[in-house]
Amino acid sequence: MLARPHRLVRGSDYRTAVRRGRRYGGPRLIVSVLDTGETRPTRFGFIVSKQVGNAVVRNTVRRRLKDACARQLPLPEGIDIVIRALPASATAPFAELLADVERAVERGAV
C-alpha cells in the first residue's frame, strides 16, 4: 500500500512533525503537516491510540488511512505528515476518512 520511502519510522521524526508542523483538525482526524525542505519523498506517519478501539479496530483504521494516503501521492518533496486518528474514525466509512485526508493534505501540502 504505502511504500517504505513514504513512511515515517523514527520517533524523533514523529515528534518534530507534531510539534513544529501546522495542525489541521476535524471530527475524525488531527493532521500535522511539516515542510522540512529536504529532497526526499513525502512521508506519512499514523497514531492510532487505544481510545479508537481494540487492536482489530485500530489496525483496520490504520490500514484505511495508509490506503487513503497512498491515493494522495505524488506530493511535493520533503513533507512529513502525521495523522492522529480520533475515536470517531473507528465507525467512519472509508469515503469519509479519504475525504478528511484529502482535505488536510490539500490545505497543508499545497
Regions found by a protein language model. Give the residues of each.
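Positively charged, solvent-exposed patches that mediate nucleic-acid binding
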Residues: 1-110
